[in-house]
UniProtKB/Swiss-Prot annotation:
Location in or out of the cell: Cytoplasm
InterPro entries, per database record: Coprogen_oxidase_aer, Coprogen_oxidase_aer_sf, Coprogen_oxidase_CS
Organism: Parasynechococcus marenigrum (strain WH8102)
EC number: 1.3.3.3
GO biological process terms, semicolon-separated: chlorophyll biosynthetic process; protoporphyrinogen IX biosynthetic process
Catalytic reaction list: coproporphyrinogen III + O2 + 2 H(+) = protoporphyrinogen IX + 2 CO2 + 2 H2O
Name of this chain's protein: Oxygen-dependent coproporphyrinogen-III oxidase
Alphabetized Pfam families for the sequence: Coprogen_oxidas
Region (Important for dimerization): 287-322
GO molecular function, one term: coproporphyrinogen oxidase activity
UniProt record similarity statement: Belongs to the aerobic coproporphyrinogen-III oxidase family.
Amino acid sequence: MVRSLVRRLLGRSQNNGTAAPALELPPEDSRARARAMVMGLQDEICAGLESLDGEGTFVEESWERPEGGGGRSRVMREGLVFEQGGVNFSEVQGQELPPSILKQRPEAKGHPWFATGTSMVLHPHNPYIPTVHLNYRYFEAGPVWWFGGGADLTPYYPFLEDARHFHRTHQAACDSVHPDLHKVFKPWCDEYFFLKHRGETRGVGGIFYDYQDSSGVLYKGQDPSGPAAGVSAQLGARPLGWEQLFALGQANGRAFLPSYAPIVEKRHPMAYGDRERQFQLYRRGRYVEFNLVWDRGTIFGLQTNGRTESILMSLPPLVRWEYGYKAEAGSREALLTELFTKPQDWLGDASLEDRCRPHGAIN
């Protein structure tokens, strides 16, 4: 009843003395549909990952949040492929928004809020298999609503075709909704998953988007002079309705297994030794640094009294730091740090093959 009243009040025209709303109103069942979508993604992805691993299974733990909402955390440990992996679902609500949200959307101040999403991080045993992350979410606060999400790949050893396959698959998912989305969401991913204190990206990127509503502004990040902002400004407004943005999250969520499973199947049989394992553990340190220092999802979860175990489930089980480490010149480890932790045009730059070929890092 309350939501219907809000919809009627916000829907008044200027003839009634009130300006029409800037945003399209979400459907009456928006929360239920968003919840069902992300829960469905969690189920589909967990089933696919158990099949991919062949031995490991997810153990589920349900939890409730005293202020409202809850979720279910699923963790796999010591599988055949995955050393540790977690796939979360959460649905939380409250009366007062945390500072991390109000900084971005001050117009949401004073409204009860609702958020639901699924997130996942997988840390494989084999250093030749990349770590991978995804997150798809929906948020409402009074008249304000938006979708956000993305997926990114973090290799420990460089393979050009792995990066290209991951990007190609997510580009196709974005293009199924609108052909201009990937042009902004790819550089936005490079921008977001960037360790400023290290001057490097977390990996080869993928896609990232946030605060997507019917306003049509594709880039709503924090670097107005960056590549993503530039592309967005050049393209201009691309108004997408609630249904299209819902379809975007669903399409990219369902693109995850096709984007990642072929990489796992190709790299899992590759033999590795202590050198590769030690480098993997060292590079995992960058993952920890990003998640604890820069990640807005981690900050939001902690500021809203989320479940700490679920929030920090993304961290790897083992990691190491080494003071002043430098990769051996000309090594594959050096290629990773020189090429695969810098923003690249993975699908359009043919010169990447020339740089990867001497290291056997194409296929």
